[in-house]
């Protein structure tokens, strides 16, 4: 089996359905004997360019290990899901299990927001 990194972008109006989508894709992978090494929900982020007149979308990154038939099934699911705006599947040499650079940035942003919220709570 090969290692893959999958990034897919979901329509911002469908953000509440992302956890169910991730669970459905994880079930597809595990039932076919694959493994999931990392799942990161990057949240709603600014797009580099407009897609279907949208400036923001919900990003998800998955690092998996599966065979070609499972990968074909996932790609088919991405293509025919109207909520998925774009998807990218990249073959990796080995499994990535640590946090991605994008996830580190998300964690830094959340830490800044939490730090900014603490002084205002102390003043109130």
From Swiss-Prot:
Question: For this UniProt entry, what's an example GO CC term?
Answer: cytosolic small ribosomal subunit
Q: List the InterPro entries hit by this protein, alphabetically.
A: Ribosomal_bS6 (IPR000529), Ribosomal_bS6_sf (IPR035980), Ribosomal_S6_plastid/chlpt (IPR020814), Transl_elong_EF1B/ribsomal_bS6 (IPR014717)
The record's annotation in SUPFAM superfamilies points to:
Ribosomal protein S6
Please indicate if the UniProt record lists Manganese as a keyword.
no
| The species this protein was found in | Burkholderia vietnamiensis (strain G4 / LMG 22486) (Burkholderia cepacia (strain R1808))
Q: Which family does it belong to?
A: Belongs to the bacterial ribosomal protein bS6 family.
Q: Name the Pfam families on file.
A: Ribosomal_S6
Q: Which UniProt keywords apply?
A: Ribonucleoprotein, Ribosomal protein, RNA-binding, rRNA-binding
Superkingdom of origin: Bacteria
Q: Name one GO biological process term.
A: translation
Q: Where is the composition biased (Low complexity)?
A: 114-124
The gene designation is rpsF
The protein's role, per its UniProt record: Binds together with bS18 to 16S ribosomal RNA.
Q: Where is this region: Disordered?
A: 96-124
Q: What one GO molecular function would you report for this record?
A: small ribosomal subunit rRNA binding
- Record keyword rRNA-binding present: yes
Q: What is this protein called?
A: Small ribosomal subunit protein bS6
């Amino acid at each position: 089996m090969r290692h893959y990194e999958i990034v897919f972008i979901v329509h911002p109006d469908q953000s509440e359905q992302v956890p169910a989508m991730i669970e459905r894709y994880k079930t597809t992978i595990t039932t076919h004997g694959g493994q999931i090494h990392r799942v990161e929900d990057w949240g709603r982020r600014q797009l580099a360019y407009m897609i279907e007149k949208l400036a923001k979308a919900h990003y998800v990154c998955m690092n998996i290990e599966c065979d070609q038939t499972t990968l074909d099934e996932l790609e088919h699911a991405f293509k025919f899901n109207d909520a998925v705006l774009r998807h990218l599947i990249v073959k990796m040499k080995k499994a990535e299990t640590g946090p991605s650079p994008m996830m580190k940035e998300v964690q830094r942003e959340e830490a800044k927001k939490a730090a900014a919220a603490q002084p205002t709570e102390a003043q109130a």
